[in-house]
Swiss-Prot record:
Function noted in UniProt: Activates KDO (a required 8-carbon sugar) for incorporation into bacterial lipopolysaccharide in Gram-negative bacteria.
Similarity comment: Belongs to the KdsB family.
CDD domains: CMP-KDO-Synthetase (cd02517)
Organism the protein comes from: Leptothrix cholodnii (strain ATCC 51168 / LMG 8142 / SP-6)
Key words of the record: Cytoplasm, Lipopolysaccharide biosynthesis, Nucleotidyltransferase, Transferase
Protein name as catalogued: 3-deoxy-manno-octulosonate cytidylyltransferase
HAMAP family assigned: KdsB (MF_00057)
GO MF, one example: 3-deoxy-manno-octulosonate cytidylyltransferase activity
GO CC, alphabetical: cytosol
Gene, per the UniProt record: kdsB
Metabolic or biological pathway: Nucleotide-sugar biosynthesis; CMP-3-deoxy-D-manno-octulosonate biosynthesis; CMP-3-deoxy-D-manno-octulosonate from 3-deoxy-D-manno-octulosonate and CTP: step 1/1; Bacterial outer membrane biogenesis; lipopolysaccharide biosynthesis
């Protein structure tokens, strides 16, 4: 049975909806100092701040709690004004995962508890995708994290460094993430074919499930050279020999919000 208002479109690729027995918390990292679009967490979307829209969307999932983790009193106050729980964290965290590690400690989460990290600029995220990431991690004792991907259908996105690609092994674990075209279609490019290889490359979707114990351990893992080169913090996990399970989503991810033009496109959705 579906929760009222919740979308179950994202049961794709054989991953069942989250087991009601799987309890998980959604954490949303949010800060004002966005480099490409400053203050976007508080950008108005149909009368509500973006971060509040994200939290409301997350609340349609099966999460037992949705909490915003921020270093901004403005963001905390905006959340409180709309009934969204928010925690204040330190301002010196280098990544969103580091911020969420502090939030796990503040919340007193058990090491086995599942946490899903939803980015603070995803106001159109599918609630079913959140459930799928939590459910997949609960099923995969061989993995410390879960994430998601969607089959690319646009050749321009294949070559776009802002669209992160992922390749997986035979049992759905990430082998590598890259901003480069991945996998590289040698024969197609050698013959000048401007098309996508078959099977289609996978576009990474920036949602992550973790055990709270691993999330607390993440900041102690040394940064990897590949992480610095690609500017992708999930590569730190693979570098240290850990595994990430990948849910194949049937639903195309919502648009990213990195420029004023992106923001205007999303605003049209909210009228």
């Amino acid at each position: 049975m579906s929760t009222p208002g919740r979308s179950d479109q994202d049961a794709g690729a054989g991953t069942p909806p989250v087991d009601p027995a799987v309890s998980f918390t959604v954490l949303v990292p949010a800060r004002l100092a966005s480099t490409r679009l400053p203050r976007k967490a508080l950008a108005d979307l149909g009368g509500l701040p973006m971060v509040v829209r994200v939290a409301q969307r997350c609340a349609l999932s099966g999460a037992s709690a949705v909490v915003v983790a921020t270093d901004s009193e403005e963001i905390r106050a905006a959340c409180a004004a709309h009934g969204v729980r928010a925690l204040m964290t330190r301002a010196d965290h280098p990544t969103g995962s580091d911020r969420l590690a502090e939030a796990c400690v503040q919340l007193g989460l058990d090491g086995r508890d599942i946490v899903v990290n939803v980015q603070g600029d995803e106001p159109l995220i599918e609630p079913g995708l959140i459930d799928a990431c939590a459910g997949l991690l609960a099923q995969r004792s061989d993995c410390v994290m879960s994430t998601a991907a969607h089959a690319l259908d646009d050749v321009e996105e294949y070559g776009n460094p802002n669209v992160v690609k992922v390749v997986t092994d035979a049992v759905g674990r990430a082998l590598y993430f890259s901003r480069a075209p991945l996998p590289w279609w040698r024969d197609g490019y050698a013959s000048g074919v401007l098309a996508l290889p078959d099977p289609a490359p996978l576009r990474h979707i920036g949602i992550y499930g973790y055990s709270a114990g691993f999330l607390r351990r993440f900041p102690s893992l040394p940064e990897s050279p590949l992480e610095r080169i690609e500017s992708l913090e999930q590569l730190r996990v693979l570098w240290h020999g850990e595994r990430i399970a990948v849910h194949l989503s049937a639903v195309r991810p919502g648009p990213g919000i990195d420029t004023p033009e992106d923001l205007e496109r999303v605003r049209r959705h909210f009228g």
